[in-house]
Amino acid sequence: MARSKNTKLLANFDCPGGGQVWVVGNTLYVGHMRQPTGTSIVDVSDPRNPKLAAKVEVPEGWHSHKVRVAGDVMIVNHEKQGPDGDASFGGGLGIYDVSKPAQPRLITKWRTHGRGVHRYDFDGRYAYISPTAEGYVGNICMILDLKDPAKPEEV
């Protein structure tokens, strides 16, 4: 394992089962492996004192372990874990306005069939996703146009 001689621990931030971390300026967006926390938004403007700014929760049986932010738009995956989980929540993507990171606002939820979205990338316009889809076995590749985040369109 590599070791750095010029680093030292300034602080830690205890959060439940972190998945992916996305950094924008002084804000960390953390996707979680287990409910109820889907996504944590952490203010690290004072690196010695990181603070939870907001969190987005998901119901039992679901997780949002991936997160991406471009501009003022945050997208998180909604993926079913195991056989349990409220089917009405549904798999897909949660699309949020994070122009005020401490107050994330759901713009819309794009739904998919089955277990939901597992991995994806987002370039600010297009989301390249791997959802489960009706008529297919397993995850497939799909592209969503988020020119208007309130109305995602499959390309």
Predicted regions and their residues:
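Feature marking well-ordered beta-strand scaffolds used for ligand recognition
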Residues: 1-155
